[in-house]
Structures are given as structure tokens and as C-alpha cells.
């Protein structure tokens, strides 16, 4: 009986610690996205490329091929006027899906959805990004 009460008393602390771990992972993932976007804005291709996961680097094996892909296919991500974080979902241990609301270089609104995966060293890397025009109104 005492064990059951002890376990019951620990349950709220365990749940709270899991929530904080999720918050820490989300913050780490957002920091990666923010850092990559800042690198794009600063024209620092090597820094931007460093946030790409191995699966992305396998497809785009050099900084130049990666930057060409981003420049030609993701102009709002490459040169945003502004951006802010939207909805986020932790889809599994070490897996994050993060919405980023972007005002592109053309002044139009876009939604980028990033996927990130925690690596064996504990860091988060960007495994993918989908981009679409948004129907929201920027402020």
C-alpha cells in the first residue's frame, strides 16, 4: 500500500518532468531553425548547411548544391522579411514538427513546416521543410 501511495505521489512530478523535457526539446529545435534562418539572411551558407540532417546532406552533398536548392526553391526561407514560430508538435522521442510563419521577400505570407530529428549527440538537425503560400494576413 505504501508503495502504491509513493508511486501515486511521484506521478505528478514525473509528468511535469516529461513536459519540461518536451519544452526543452521544442526550444532546442526552434533555436536550430532560428539559427539557420539567420545564417541564410547573413549569406552564410556553411552555417546554414550545418543545421541540415544527414538525410538532407546525402541529397545535397555540398554547401553550394544545398544553397542553390534553397535559393531556387525556397526564396521565402532564403530571404525572409520576417518570421515567427507557429504551431509545434512533438511527434515522438526526439522528433519535432514546427510551423514557421514567414513574410517572404515579395511581401507575401508563407507557411514553412520544418521536421527535425534529435541526433545521437543530442543536437537537433533539420530533416525537411515544406513551403506553401499562406492565406493568413501578416501584421
What are these regions (language model features)?
Residues 1-2:
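N-terminal secretory signal peptides that target proteins for export/translocation
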Residues 7-17:
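Bacterial N-terminal signal peptides
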Residues 16-24:
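Bacterial Sec-dependent signal peptides at the C-terminal "C-region" and cleavage site
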Residues 23-31, 35, 45-94:
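Short solvent-exposed beta->alpha transition segments
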Residues 87-139:
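Exposed beta-sheet edge and beta->alpha loop/turn motif
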Amino acid at each position: 500500500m505504501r508503495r502504491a501511495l509513493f508511486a501515486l505521489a511521484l506521478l505528478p512530478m514525473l509528468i511535469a518532468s516529461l513536459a519540461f523535457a518536451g519544452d526543452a526539446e521544442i526550444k532546442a529545435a526552434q533555436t536550430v531553425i532560428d539559427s539557420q534562418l539567420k545564417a541564410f539572411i547573413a549569406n552564410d551558407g556553411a552555417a546554414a548547411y550545418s543545421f541540415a540532417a544527414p538525410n538532407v546532406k546525402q541529397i545535397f552533398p555540398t554547401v553550394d548544391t544545398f544553397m542553390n536548392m534553397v535559393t531556387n526553391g525556397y526564396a521565402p526561407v532564403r530571404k525572409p522579411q520576417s518570421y515567427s514560430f507557429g504551431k509545434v508538435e512533438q511527434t515522438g522521442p526526439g522528433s519535432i514538427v514546427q510551423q514557421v510563419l514567414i513574410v517572404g521577400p515579395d511581401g507575401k505570407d508563407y507557411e514553412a513546416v520544418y521536421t527535425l530529428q534529435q541526433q545521437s549527440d543530442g543536437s537537433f538537425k533539420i530533416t525537411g521543410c515544406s513551403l506553401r503560400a499562406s492565406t493568413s494576413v501578416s501584421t
